[in-house]
From Swiss-Prot:
Segments forming domain Peptidase M14: 287-610
Gene3D superfamilies: Carboxypeptidase-like, regulatory domain, Galactose-binding domain-like, Zn peptidases
Gene label: Cpxm1
Native source organism of the sequence: Mus musculus
Span of the signal peptide: 1-20
Name recorded for this polypeptide: Probable carboxypeptidase X1
GO annotation, cellular component aspect: extracellular space
Source lineage: Eukaryota, Metazoa, Chordata, Craniata, Vertebrata
One of the Pfam families matching this protein, by short name: CarboxypepD_reg
Tissues and organs where the protein is expressed, per its UniProt entry: Strongly expressed in testis and spleen. Moderately expressed in salivary gland, brain, heart, lung, and kidney. Extremely low expression in liver and muscle. No expression in eye, adrenal, and white adipose tissues.
Compositionally biased residues, Polar residues: 36-49
């Protein structure tokens, strides 16, 4: 967000600020624009620009610079990407702007859904799926056009005066508009210029005009996806705002996705205005943190709570930024026997910023509440070792942060600096397991757990991001039991498998052997998340996950080969789900207090699930030392876990009666019944293993034949019996 504010401040002399703004021989009109019948601006003859590739947009902008230099009467267009309003019929006039601008107004809430469907109206719509309620910034369409979930508001073709209207419910100070075109894989629809109207009663309207009294035509989009911001030359106090498309892409339709920037104004009838502000008793830091600010905040938490925190790095990004982790425990830096390890990972996709801020808020909250003596937090930190990785992809985040919350779009910053999607970059162990299962090799020949990395994945020329390798080494170094991967752009919890078992299937229900546990974990988070439990909320984009409790099998949503969830399950002991936290990938700072309240209890409750099921220590019966890498198998579940280096283990299970087996190389297998109840805390299930005669003999031979006296006498008696 600060990237947006800095950009707007820097461009304050300009009326508008937009990335990928259109360029044409007539100011403000995109190449190939179609004029609305009532427009008084002549149609340009420039060939349509039908691509949104960045290098093409930059080339067009450079052309615009050349044109502007030739037109001496026009003001300099400003920095790259600056969108400027157009004054029809008076191209030589210069628009004089007031010195005071209001770039800091937050979004009204079309993208975050704070603006309800009932607050959006339009002059017409091509279909219900293209209605006014779909005119929200960054809204995504379904795979098929023409259904109930298309990717924009689109007016009817015969509508000669189309408009999209937003009701703010109360008077606000409108300061700017962000627009996009239609999200579709089949259509090319976007508005290239528009006018703006305001009203207090939806009956009497006035337009945004320049100092000479002429209507301002704002330049809009030159592609469907790049957000373009236009600031009003003079902020307007009103309740309603209308966007009136004037021109649109040639051969397309007037289609819009939008966000409105507006500042609240004082209401003389509101006696308690402070009651509408969501505060925090813990003085938490509700703002977006770039790399430097994140590091500073983590250091402050560590200094406030040095006895329960430790900061460490698991590696570096491609750009050299460290992947910092905050460890929180009563004995930081130490694995305590019998204490489970749990992690939260955020920022795998750099533009999905909410998870990063929630983890920074969580570490502040845990520190404050521990110092305050909160019993729930105290117990959590004394019985669990927590690891928080707020930014797995810091390079991508810095890109998104620089663009700002409203201009980052849907995908910019998602990938690493190398262009790698980290959630498709882990080794595909699913195919390896499923082929072995089809050949009847599991579990006798091929294990059903801790599958090794494929050879191709470790080759020097393998396309594996340094961020991915850092997390893999982290997974192998610490015996994690439970994890959640925090994403954004939806409101749902997805669980493994993420990859479909049928090759090339786009989606297919593909459960793990631990499907009951994963559904439990997912339901726990979804059931304690306030936004997911809001029965009145509308779907974010094209699927209504509330019909199924806001949880879904990942592969049944869309296949994701090489996901971190699947890799964690098949390569380590750790069970991991993906939490999609919000419809808005990069919510404005104004939204952070509410998002924290939506997720606070869910984050804590999910951490507490690490103590469900059974736990224990597998020891050598003679020495009583823990046995590392012993295999814990549960009858009826074709997925095993192993013990840590001290012999301790944790096996997540839902309530029920289980037959559990412990085995280790050189030891007799031991089996026992373990009953998991709904009582709080794990059920202890310890094992004592006895070495096999073969193992004893191997150890004796290792002592160069020097047998103990008792064993020597037994051997002599056996020889005498012969």
């Amino acid at each position: 967000m600060w990237g947006l504010l800095l950009a707007v401040t820097a461009f304050a002399p300009s009326v508008g600020l937009g990335l990928g703004a259109p360029s044409a021989s007539v100011p403000g009109l995109a190449p190939g624009s179609t004029l609305a019948p009532h427009s008084s601006v002549a149609q340009p003859s420039t060939k349509a620009n039908e691509t949104s590739e960045r290098h093409v947009r930059l080339r067009v902008i450079k052309k615009k610079k050349i044109v502007v230099k030739k037109r001496k009467k026009l003001r300099h267009p400003g920095p790259l990407g600056t969108a400027r309003p157009v004054v029809p019929t008076h191209p030589a006039k210069t628009l004089t702007l007031p010195e005071k601008q209001e770039p800091g107004c937050p979004p009204l809430g079309l993208e975050s859904l704070r603006v309800s469907d009932s607050q959006l109206e339009a002059s017409s719509s091509q279909s219900f799926g293209l209605g006014a309620h779909r005119g929200r910034l960054n809204i995504q369409s379904g795979l098929e056009d023409g259904d109930l979930y298309d990717g924009a508001w689109c007016a009817e073709q015969q509508d000669t005066e189309p408009w999209l209207q937003v009701d703010a419910k109360n008077p606000v100070r409108f300061a700017g508009i962000v627009t996009q075109g239609r999200n579709s894989v089949w259509r090319y629809d976007w508005v290239t210029s528009f006018k703006v109207q305001f009203s207090n009663d939806s009956q009497t309207w006035w337009k945004s005009r320049n100092s000479t009294g002429m209507d301002i035509v704002f330049p809009a989009n030159s592609d469907a996806e790049t957000p373009v911001l236009n600031l009003l030359p003079e902020p307007q106090v009103a309740r309603f705002i209308r966007l009136l498309p004037q021109t649109w892409f040639q051969g397309g339709a007037p289609c819009l996705r939008a966000e409105i920037l507006a500042c609240p104004v004082s209401d003389p009838n509101d006696l308690f205005p402070e009651a509408h502000t969501l505060g925090s008793s813990n003085s938490l830091d509700f703002r977006h943190h770039n790399y430097k600010a994140m590091r500073k905040l983590m250091k402050q938490v560590n200094e406030q709570c040095p006895n329960i925190t430790r900061i460490y790095s698991i590696g570096k990004s491609h750009q050299g930024l460290k992947l910092y982790v905050m460890e929180m425990s009563d004995h930081p830096g130490e694995h305590e026997l019998g204490e489970p390890e749990v992690r939260y990972v955020a920022g795998m996709h750099g533009n999905e910023a909410l998870g990063r801020e929630l983890l920074l808020l969580l570490m502040q909250f845990l520190c404050h509440e521990f110092l305050r003596g909160d019993p729930r937090v105290t117990r959590l930190l004394t019985e669990t070792r927590i690891h928080l990785l707020p930014s797995m992809n810091p390079d991508g985040y810095e890109t998104a942060y620089h663009r700002g919350s409203e201009l980052v779009g849907w995908a910019e910053g998602r990938w690493t600096h190398q262009g790698i999607d980290l959630n498709h970059n882990f080794a595909d162990l699913n195919t390896q397991l499923w082929y072995a299962e089809d050949d009847g090799l599991v579990p006798d020949t091929v294990p059903n757990h801790h599958l090794p990395l494929p050879t191709y994945y470790t080759l020097p020329n393998a396309t594996v991001a340094p961020e991915t390798w850092a997390v893999i080494k982290w997974m192998k170094r610490i015996p994690f039991v439970l994890s959640a991967n925090l994403h954004g752009g939806e409101l749902v919890v997805s669980y493994p498998f993420d990859m479909t078992r049928t090759p090339w299937a786009a989606r297919e229900l593909t459960p793990t052997p631990d499907d009951a546990v994963f559904r439990w974990l997912s339901t726990v988070y979804a059931g304690t998340n306030r936004a997911m439990q809001d029965t009145d909320r509308r779907p974010c984009h094209s699927q209504d996950f509330s019909l199924h409790g806001n949880v879904i099998n990942g592969a049944d949503w869309h296949t994701v080969p090489g996901s971190m969830n699947d890799f964690s399950y098949l390569h380590t002991n750790c069970f991991e789900v993906t939490v999609e936290l919000s419809c808005d990938k990069f919510p404005h700072e104004k939204e952070l207090p509410q998002e924290w309240e939506n997720n606070k209890d869910a984050l804590l409750t999910y951490l507490e699930q690490v103590r469900m099921g059974i736990t224990g220590v597998v020891r050598d019966k003679d020495t009583e030392l823990g046995i590392a890498d012993a295999v814990i198998a549960v009858e009826g579940i074709n997925h095993d876990v192993t013990t840590a280096w001290g012999g301790d283990y944790w096996r997540l299970l839902t309530p029920g009666d289980y037959v559990v087996t412990a085995s280790a190389e050189g030891y007799h297998t031991v089996r026992q019944h373990c009953q998991v109840t709904f009582e709080e805390g794990p059920v202890p299930c310890n094992f004592l293993l006895t070495k096999t005669p073969k193992e004893r003999l191997r150890e004796l031979l290792a002592t160069r034949g020097k047998l103990p006296p008792d064993l020597r006498r037994k051997l002599e008696r056996l020889r005498g019996q012969k």
